[in-house]
Structures are given as structure tokens and as C-alpha cells.
Amino acid sequence: MFDLRTKVMIGIASTLLIAAIMLITLVFCLYQKISKALKLAKEPECCIDPCKDPNEKIIRAKPIIAETCRNLPCCDDCSIYKDVGSLPPCYCVTNEGL
């Protein structure tokens, strides 16, 4: 019915069509997986699992109260490198430089 040249062209065209459909499907599946992973990453960590008891209370972490900061040593007392000229201004008092 068809000559050899036409059969070869139909075979090449069908192979390219199948390859294009497979690549489109692969890209679509990867897009779905990435969008699902990004959507799950945006959800808050303290949400309630639907499999657990809905009346369960969420216990939040208590804030850590910062202790009073001690004074930092002056930069002249703790210079590390001999070849370095002047170091940045030292902060002997925690409020200095703020």
C-alpha cells in the first residue's frame, strides 16, 4: 500500500510523537511532585494531624528568657594577629555601638 520511504517516515513521525508525549507526561509528573512538596513545606508545623484526636491540645514551646549579658572584653586586650594594624572599635559595654 505504501512504499518503503513513506513507511519509514510514518515510523519516524510516530516515534517522535510517542517520545514527545512521554516527555510531556514526565514534566507534568515532576511538576506535580514539586508543587506538592512546596505546598506541604508552607503549612505550619503545629497543625493538627487529622488522624489524631481533634480535641487534643497543642502545647507550644516556652520562650527562653535571656540572661543578663556579661561585658565583652576590649579588642586591645585580645588582639590575635600581630601583623594586623587597627582592629574595629571594641565593645567593652554591651550597649556601646548599638
UniProtKB/Swiss-Prot annotation:
The record, for Pfam families, names: FAM24
The family annotation for this protein states: Belongs to the FAM24 family.
Going by the UniProt record, its keywords in alphabetical order are: Secreted, Signal
**Can you say where in the cell this protein is located?**
Secreted
- Report the main location listed first in the record: secreted
- Span of the secretion signal? 1-29
Q: What is this protein called?
A: Protein FAM24A
Q: Its GO CC terms?
A: extracellular region
Look up keyword Signal and say if it applies.
Answer: yes
What taxonomic classification does the UniProt entry list for its organism? Eukaryota, Metazoa, Chordata, Craniata, Vertebrata
What's the domain of life for this entry?
A: Eukaryota
Q: Does the keyword Signal apply?
A: yes
Q: Report TM segments.
A: none
